């Protein structure tokens, strides 16, 4: 597992049989370059599998437009909410071999479970939040709680048919 800004990531060509991305593409804006890079990193028969959050038809940026725009400022800085069809417009280097669309209600349940788990373990988590966030630990506790609540509401909206989960399997061109 590598944790790094994907825009700065480099590997030798034809290094990987498989690349798996879970909830990373929402933090990227230059899909064309990222798909090109990944295609170089994959072996000839390599596959890319992506899991993303997406909207059923809208793509929109996460941009801080007002002082109280906390989700864009703290959780998705500089990223995009892709539409379910967004990746179909970026197939110069990789081609979508198969695509799956899942109801947002799955993530609604996940976000609610994370919130419940966080609340049940507050005493255990508080020192960790203090270590990571310092004097802002209480603020960040509330941000995370609101994040889970907001995600649960968004992804559960209209029975999970607006904000979705997209899975994609790509092959090299």
Predicted regions and their residues:
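A short glycine-rich, Lys/Arg-flanked "PGG" loop and its adjoining helix->strand segment in the class I
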Residues: 32-47
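Alpha/beta-hydrolase-fold catalytic nucleophile elbow
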Residues: 51
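A short acidic, Gly/Pro-enriched loop at the edge of an enzyme's catalytic core
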Residues: 7-19
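A short SAM/SAH-binding and catalytic strip from SAM-dependent methyltransferases
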Residues: 17-30
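Substrate-binding/catalytic lobe of Class I Rossmann-like enzymes that use SAM or dcSAM, i.e.
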Residues: 54-56, 60-165, 171-173
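Short conserved AdoMet
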Residues: 29, 43, 91
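Phosphate/diphosphate-binding loops
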Residues: 4-6, 22-23, 34
